[in-house]
Amino acid sequence: MPGQPTRDQVAALVDHTLLKPEATAADVVALVAEAADLGVYAVCVSPSMVPAAVSAGGVRVATVAGFPSGKHASAIKAHEAALAVACGAVEVDMVIDVGAALAGHLDAVRSDIEAVRCATSGAVLKVIVESAALLGLADESTLIGVCRVAEDAGADFVKTSTGFHPAGGASTRAVEVMASAVGGRLGVKASGGIRTATDAVAMLSAGATRLGLSGTRAVLEGLGQN
């Protein structure tokens, strides 16, 4: 996104996120109300919380699959995603098996993504690649390879991070590499550690087309009023 984006422009790209294990249904209802007030794109909640978010109404609902480790069997990820879509989720953020990617088993990564893609027809599929781990434990070529596999498997977005991996969250370097790899054919979601307006603008300038934020209000307030 060129130039300085407005508050509303950024809000329209935000998945307002609550994935803490201790989150309650009441917390999710409050999240949805806040999301509607802030004018964000969607909320992102745990699969078991999708019904509460959908019932609260007024905002798109995204969820996760294989979260946060990505070590679930592909059939489990696919079933989890399918159940969430049946409950009203319109977007699914799945986690790859990072170990498989680091070992160079890209066919396994592709099959994993394809399983979830087949189970979520009509929903937007984002593939979480844990970019900090791939860059820290391997190199840019590994990250590029995973992004291209995600594209081949039918993903709509590649996403930097769960926000739970010890290697860290989003970085402008990772977003730039990912955006270059998919060349505008897929969206790029930056998520994990984006806490300020400066962080958000930097990610958008690097090529992100969606942001995953838990502290959304603070980020938007940092952008001022339109």
UniProtKB/Swiss-Prot annotation:
Its EC number is 4.1.2.4. GO terms for cellular component: cytoplasm. It catalyses: 2-deoxy-D-ribose 5-phosphate = D-glyceraldehyde 3-phosphate + acetaldehyde. InterPro entries: Aldolase_TIM, DeoC, DeoC/FbaB/LacD_aldolase, DeoC_typeI. GO terms for biological process: 2-deoxyribose 1-phosphate catabolic process; carbohydrate catabolic process; deoxyribonucleotide catabolic process. The keyword Hydrolase does not apply. The keyword DNA-binding does not apply. The active site is at 93 (proton donor/acceptor), 159 (schiff-base intermediate with acetaldehyde), 189 (proton donor/acceptor). Keywords: Cytoplasm, Lyase, Schiff base. Catalyzes a reversible aldol reaction between acetaldehyde and D-glyceraldehyde 3-phosphate to generate 2-deoxy-D-ribose 5-phosphate. This is Deoxyribose-phosphate aldolase. GO terms for molecular function: deoxyribose-phosphate aldolase activity. Belongs to the DeoC/FbaB aldolase family. DeoC type 1 subfamily. It is found in: Cytoplasm. SUPFAM superfamilies: Aldolase. It comes from the Bacteria. It is an enzyme of class 4 (lyase). Pfam families: DeoC (PF01791). The gene is deoC. Pathway: Carbohydrate degradation; 2-deoxy-D-ribose 1-phosphate degradation; D-glyceraldehyde 3-phosphate and acetaldehyde from 2-deoxy-alpha-D-ribose 1-phosphate: step 2/2. SMART domains: DeoC (SM01133).
